[in-house]
Amino acid sequence: MMRFRSAIFLAMVVATGCGGDDPLTGPGGLTLSFTPVALDLGTTRSATIQITNTGAADVGPIELAGGQVAGPGGLPIAGSQLSATPSQFPTLRAGASADITIDLTLPTDIQSGSYQANLTAMVDQQSAAVLTVDFSVPVVSPFFGTVTITSGTVTPRQGDVETYTAEVRDSTGQVTTGETVTWSVVPFTAGLADASGRVVGYTPGAASVVASVGGVTDELDVTILARGAPSGSFVSIGEGSVTTRFTSDHWEHGNVAYTGTWGCRDGSGNLCGTGGVLGNRLFVWDISVPSAPVLTDSVAIDARTLNDVKISADGSLGVITHEGSSDLMNGITLLDLADPLHPAVITRLVDSDLFTGVHNVWIEGNYVYLAVDGSGLRIADISDPAAPTIEASFYGGSSFLHDVYVRDGLAFLSHWDAGLIILDVGDPTNPQEVSRIDIPGFLVHNAWYWPAAGYVFLGDETGSPGVMRVVDVRDLTAPVQVASLSISGAPPHNFWIDEDRGIGYFAWYELGIQAVDVTGDLMGRLELQGRRI
């Protein structure tokens, strides 16, 4: 897994290294297959299929390429498209399967008959599996009425979600609500429309919003305006370096920064198995002068990795995590921050439940939420910091809980291949599952909940292309993915949302920090909407 150098970057977001191996790639010997191997949709336009890696090695990244539909004689049908969601998998584990939703987009004037399209799984730009999709277009009973687009802007801004409405009248001229209106954008590369008439523009310039009923259409010509997102650049204003250890996590409170360490680093600055310096130390920095951070103290613990550090909201208490402790007990250490530049150890919480290691934590009130390696969530009462006790637990299934984020009485669990799990922790001693969303092929690594917007931003650390996904949780009982941000070359890591300004800061491994405009309703592919700052 890729790692940052040991330099500590005093910025809003610092990417934290996590353990793992790079996915194996390459077309030779790939054993990907679709189920079914051929599909007849009949007159439907969508279906769920599976892709399976039947081999012994992980495979990725996998691109799912659709394309135009072929009509009689094999000629492509203009305005047609077979698409897949998700359109890519950073990694498909050996023996694993993932669901894929395929959708057909067809021009409104397509003739009745039989048609065919192919979905190809590509690895290293070579075909690894092909699914043949057959479907038919029936003779449509003619609709003798009219459809008229009645509202919606003709100058939508790129990336803004606009709502369009249409009026349908039957052959007698009476308004009817018994017909289903189908919405689309022409050309399809110009934007995305959903079934309710919500449209988001991708490409600035001329386009059309189309409403269709039974072969009768109305088109509204629109001009998609460039988004004009703010532009800028990051400027390094200060740096503090520790050359003997790798830096893991970073947390700031007031004018103090706290940084963790991980792994084993040898004298040449390389990752080592033994014989080097372990990641067993928390460093404390005075950043009251950001251009000249000063290392003021450190705290050593029994660990190979101090992966996470969190500070209580009032700044009085710190929590650091243990992984790879020599006594095999691991757990967490609580710190007294009466003098924030010189923490004092209060106690260490160990338990047989924690021996595998604690990867991440969150402090909320008198409780600490612990993401325990391989065994889910533990909730500890720290109302008496000298005598913390574990009060509750939760496990989301046969997967790895990587991170936990708590806000407004809710805990958001980044539960790897079990997806995002939302818990009601109004009573921290009795957590209750509210809902979950499992995104096929997506290993949920981290989450940020933005209550005012009603969104959760999810990261996946598995490979390239890296994908951040946006989940709408305005109905907490029914989370649904509504948008994504895909950037090739590296996976994302940790996020921080400036909610006042509507800017997301996304750590993206060697691609640095990505600043993205996340204002307004979010829908579709954000990387096509001129939102990257």
How would you name each of these model-derived features?
Residues 15-17:
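C-terminal motif of bacterial Sec signal peptides marking the signal peptidase cleavage site
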Residues 22, 26-33, 56-102:
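Surface-exposed binding patches on compact interaction domains or structured appendages
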Residues 22-56, 89, 147-160:
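Beta-sheet-dominated interaction scaffolds and their linkers
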Residues 29, 92-95, 125-127, 139-228:
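Extracytoplasmic soluble-region selector
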Residues 41-48, 98-100, 110-118, 158-165, ...:
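Short, solvent-exposed loop/turn segments enriched in Ser/Thr/Gly
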Residues 54-57, 108, 172:
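Short, acidic/polar linear motifs in exposed loop/turn regions
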Residues 109-138:
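Terminal connector regions
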Residues 225-533:
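Feature marking well-ordered beta-strand scaffolds used for ligand recognition
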